[in-house]
Amino acid sequence: MSSCKTTLSEMVGSVTKDRGTINVKARTRSSNVTFKPPVTHDMVRSLFDPTLKKSLLEKCIALAIISNFFICYWVFQRFGLQFTKYFFLVQYLFWRIAYNLGIGLVLHYQSHYETLTNCAKTHAIFSKIPHNKDANSNFSTNSNSFSEKFWNFIRKFCQYEIRSKMPKEYDLFAYPEEINVWLIFRQFVDLILMQDFVTYIIYVYLSIPYSWVQIFNWRSLLGVILILFNIWVKLDAHRVVKDYAWYWGDFFFLEESELIFDGVFNISPHPMYSIGYLGYYGLSLICNDYKVLLVSVFGHYSQFLFLKYVENPHIERTYGDGTDSDSQMNSRIDDLISKENYDYSRPLINMGLSFNNFNKLRFTDYFTIGTVAALMLGTIMNARFINLNYLFITVFVTKLVSWLFISTILYKQSQSKWFTRLFLENGYTQVYSYEQWQFIYNYYLVLTYTLMIIYTGLQIWSNFSNINNSQLIFGLILVALQTWCDKETRLAISDFGWFYGDFFLSNYISTRKLTSQGIYRYLNHPEAVLGVVGVWGTVLMTNFAVTNIILAVLWTLTNFILVKFIETPHVNKIYGKTKRVSGVGKTLLGLKPLRQVSDIVNRIENIIIKSLVDESKNSNGGAELLPKNYQDNKEWNILIQEAMDSVATRLSPYCELKIENEQIETNFVLPTPVTLNWKMPIELYNGDDWIGLYKVIDTRADREKTRVGSGGHWSATSKDSYMNHGLRHKESVTEIKATEKYVQGKVTFDTSLLYFENGIYEFRYHSGNSHKVLLISTPFEISLPVLNTTTPELFEKDLTEFLTKVNVLKDGKFRPLGNKFFGMDSLKQLIKNSIGVELSSEYMRRVNGDAHVISHRAWDIKQTLDSLA
């Protein structure tokens, strides 16, 4: 892997082994000539180690580096501090441009066209005899043109450079031009990089405050930590990639090795370009000068441009883009959703200050952008009149309430697919519900961050005189870091992952494997670590305002809770509990002290778990001592009931209220009617006696008087009574006869009198036209049927048959007027009881109660939810 090599490590040197001590093979890029690379050394050893041979250029480079300090002293004495600072600032800018633009252009053309290699071959720079001369010609004396003299000089100089630099056993002509060109190229890289580093260090040194009070503070301590970390990054990076990649060797020839991800390369993407520049910011902290910080930001940013336009394209052409089929899973899911749903369009996404996937025909996009525009314009036009305290409360409440709303949706969706069910039961599709969620989530992010930006901006504006410029810039850097994290996260997991697609469309996931590509190679939950650094950046920008600290804490806590208690359990449920160790985790666990601490914690955890398990076993051991008869509650209840019935019969031999076949059947599945046999002594019977049907939970323990209404679920005991109450309550009387001692009869409760709710019920025999209870039946169960859901056709058939028996189906449509006890809610419960899904009343009204549409819609919803399981 090619890597940048600037700043601190060049002054420290490498503690790693020389690359030549390892048996490495290489080959040229175009001609595929195989060779063994020679022994080379890192930059600092090559220039300053007196035990190594030095070429002319290396001596000149070392002299140029040392001369900078003498020049600094002379200019300082003659022109003063400010002029010297700007003098070396201009030098640094020159060398930085020479690095990023100069070396960048050279490497660009070398990568695409092998320009340097072809130039060396064309002009025979590393050949014994030039290609255009025969063996008997004298190249140095017979070359009269300026061009030939020039290339003859270059040829001799380059060969002299390599011979004076390399060991005696190095055969210049035995190696291909690529390796020799690379050795010469290294010399110019040494000059530019060392000058870039030294001029920057001198500029920083001249910017350090003279007051000891300004130097010895928390900023300097943090700065030293960053510098030391930067040194470790450089040393570890050189240990991993050696100077083959340190000097962009793969632009010239290829070693037989793969891209390496070890050590510091497990901590951060492109560590030499990212965390490899933390020393810049450490020095800026020590100086406490925003001008130094701006220069450092310029140097770092230009390095990212070098990475983007030079190194990354070359790495992708040489090694591939580093993605595999698993890493592209989410992207393929996005494509699949678009392919299978023609009305689906990619969601609007806010990234930094821009919006992606804007759809001019989608109203919600205008609503989102309009909200931002209205808030911004309103703030600008009324900035003087805005009360910051009220605005703070608004930001806090908006963030908290909207987060609770978002978290509730995700939690309930994870537990029961609640959000998807809500839309399915109202006639919408699974993907449509996902689109609505995408809008809600993006609007939540846009709204909360817009309010945060407005509040922070007004805070800075109202206290600008007290704002530290360096803190302001550092805060903006943290904001940029969070924006970068968001973009890298979305790049790694695509729109599907960004919008928690596995909560809503888990049936689209073909491979149950978490991605470890991109930023997820280094962090398991980047949004939890780097996803709030920008908010803490606002704390810096506002000079540690208490209100901004409160908002930053709120952002951090809500983010942590969402990841820890909602996202992580759901991910474990979908992808399994396979523990994914991040690159940072691997590196930290590789450090011996931390590994020892981790082992101690694991041992303590195992001891605690073992003790809890042993205690649980001891506490549960008493259950085994209970007699078996006491553990069978059902059998015990049956014995109690039989004993009570026996006592009641002896006390009143002519009082009886029994359900027909109650010994055989205690659970009646609708629409099965329930027939009741009753018997009453002749002296107690009244023609107005009636029997009501009640839920046991409603009547409770009141056995003498019924204190709840029957709601129409009652029947007379005689056909001659209750003439003004319609036929329904008399037609249920199927038999009645009297003897000298008692009156007995039969009453049948069919679908016109029964409840259409699952539950435990009982019959109550009431005396006369009152609610005084004479007899109570044995409790029994009524349940809705489970219709055949094998196919949508069978489900429709069973549904229509049931509705016909209940007398609520006419012309294939549901008509609840036929049975006042079977309404829309009963139909919803019937469908839910059979197929496990629920349709909304609004949807069933919208389709005119069509049994065919309703049954097939419920079937489709079941198929969708089953695929999400």
From Swiss-Prot:
Residues 77-86, 209-212, 280-291, 384-389, 461-463, 556-869 are cytoplasmic. Pathway: Phospholipid metabolism; phosphatidylcholine biosynthesis. GO terms for cellular component: endoplasmic reticulum membrane. One of its GO terms (molecular function) is phosphatidylethanolamine N-methyltransferase activity. It comes from Saccharomyces cerevisiae (strain AWRI1631) (Baker's yeast). PANTHER family: PHOSPHATIDYLETHANOLAMINE N-METHYLTRANSFERASE. Keywords: Acetylation, Endoplasmic reticulum, Lipid biosynthesis, Lipid metabolism, Membrane, Methyltransferase, Phospholipid biosynthesis, Phospholipid metabolism, S-adenosyl-L-methionine, Transferase, Transmembrane, Transmembrane helix. Catalyzes the first step of the methylation pathway of phosphatidylcholine biosynthesis, the SAM-dependent methylation of phosphatidylethanolamine (PE) to phosphatidylmonomethylethanolamine (PMME). Belongs to the class VI-like SAM-binding methyltransferase superfamily. CHO2 family. It catalyses: a 1,2-diacyl-sn-glycero-3-phosphoethanolamine + S-adenosyl-L-methionine = a 1,2-diacyl-sn-glycero-3-phospho-N-methylethanolamine + S-adenosyl-L-homocysteine + H(+). This is Phosphatidylethanolamine N-methyltransferase.
